[in-house]
Design a protein with these regions (language model features):
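Short S/T/G/P-rich N-terminal loop/turn motif that feeds into the first structured element of a domain
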Residues: 1-173
């Protein structure tokens, strides 16, 4: 998710877990048992990127395939901290949820392996399914855009995002 060279990648492996305990249990299982699966995949693992991430919101319900994920590269304005952005985004997500929003949102920070990445963080938005994303998109236009003070506060906190890109996703178990 830190690359501009999408044509050079067959897929992006994105692990989605409800918390760090399950994330690292999944990683342990992969390290101990994933070699056979990796050998069968019709692709070459060209990069491993480690990120720290904080959940802003988690969608209710089950995750179905196919899903939908959006990434945006973001930079902080001078003197603004990631905690300020997170807190404003969290307040906005909670207000949007009261209106019926059910998107998952994360703020992600590259730690290792993201060569050439010159942004401070990523914003990630995802839905449990393609149809759920459609419902949330309609909700955005009908009830949220320009109507929530928390959205205005988020817009004024002091950061900018670019390079919005979206992917479909599928569950692999």
């Amino acid at each position: 998710y830190f690359t501009q060279e999408l044509s050079s990648h067959d897929f992006i492996w994105y692990g989605r877990y409800p918390n760090s305990t399950e994330q690292f249990a999944g990683l342990q299982y992969w390290v101990e048992n994933g070699g056979d699966l990796l050998a069968k995949l019709p692709a070459v693992n060209s990069a491993v990127v480690e990120v720290w991430q904080r959940d802003i919101s988690i969608p209710d319900g089950e995750s179905y395939s196919p899903g939908y994920v959006i990434y945006m590269d973001c930079k902080l304005d001078e003197g603004v901290t990631t905690d300020e952005v997170y807190n404003a985004y969290y307040a906005y997500a909670q207000a949007a949820k009261k209106e019926g929003d059910n998107l998952g949102r994360k703020i992600m920070f590259p730690v290792t392996g993201a060569e050439g990445y010159d942004h401070d963080f990523l914003i990630v938005m995802y839905a449990n399914s393609l149809s759920d994303y459609g419902k949330n998109n309609d909700l955005w236009w009908d009830k949220i855009i320009g109507q929530l003070p928390e959205q205005q506060a988020l817009a004024e906190v002091g950061y900018s995002c670019e390079n919005r890109r979206s992917y479909t996703s599928m569950n692999i178990k």
